Amino acid sequence: MLKNVVNRVSGRKRLAKLLGLSLKQEGDRQFLLDMLPKGSVGAEIGVHLGDFSQEIIDIISPGELHLIDPWEHLTSSIYKTAWYGGGAKGGQVEMEERYASIRERFYQCLHANQVKVHRGYSTDILRQFPDQYFDWVYIDGNHLYEYVRKGLELSFQKMSNWMGT
């Protein structure tokens, strides 16, 4: 998870060096899937259409996977290129369709209680879980610094110690 966060930060090579991390090519998430334990309890913040969620299910076969996303169209100019802003030409209607597609795509996993879909902001949703509930949290939601920072702080509180947190 830390490598993924570092990959998204300006000056990531320097930050990775300070943290003692070696980075793979940007966009390569396979290394994350390889290091996450099978049967673990995890959360994905920022689900979009569920493509990475599907990879998590297929490769990790988590005991529980919590998919967290507000599926909300944001109209502020700072989101003009984001898939949840200007990139969603259909506005909130498109977001409702994306949410419905997630529920349909993971229908069997939902009914097997392997996947749980939470619609809302990650900070609000994560607060509903006890501390150290998750084995891992994958953060790929709102990419603005303040939101990433809040997500990281709360995620570390909600994760167990398997990754040394």
Can you name each region flagged by the protein language model?
Residues 1-39:
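Class I SAM-dependent methyltransferase Rossmann-like catalytic core
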Residues 29-165:
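S-adenosylmethionine/decaboxylated-SAM
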